[in-house]
């Protein structure tokens, strides 16, 4: 346990941020998993809707600094490519 007042505050802030980031990452994983499940069943319309939702969550996570912007771009690209393969 820290004795310095500023370090006690930093620990408190870090714990709050860790929990917030964990929540964002969890909802992000859920959105991507739902997209993959819809894509595997072959439901194009549902997959397209879920792709937009996942892309929105990826952008939001990147803007909050939970994940890196390039990681968000790569994941969005991968799911967009998968949706494009349905129509091709």
Swiss-Prot record:
Bias (Basic residues) ranges:
7-23
Cellular component, GO annotation = cytosol; small ribosomal subunit
Q: Region entry Disordered: which residue ranges?
A: 1-28
Task: Give any GO molecular function from the UniProt entry.
Answer: structural constituent of ribosome
Which UniProt keyword terms apply here? Ribonucleoprotein, Ribosomal protein, RNA-binding, rRNA-binding
InterPro entries named among the record's database cross-references: Ribosomal_bS20, Ribosomal_bS20_sf
Keyword Iron-sulfur in the entry? The reply is no
The transmembrane segments are none
Tell me, what does this protein do in biology?
A: Binds directly to 16S ribosomal RNA.
Alphabetical list of NCBIfam families matching this protein: S20
Q: Which HAMAP family does the entry link to?
A: Ribosomal_bS20
Q: Which family does it belong to?
A: Belongs to the bacterial ribosomal protein bS20 family.
Q: Which PANTHER family match?
A: 30S RIBOSOMAL PROTEIN S20, SMALL RIBOSOMAL SUBUNIT PROTEIN BS20C
**Could you tell me what this protein is called?**
Small ribosomal subunit protein bS20
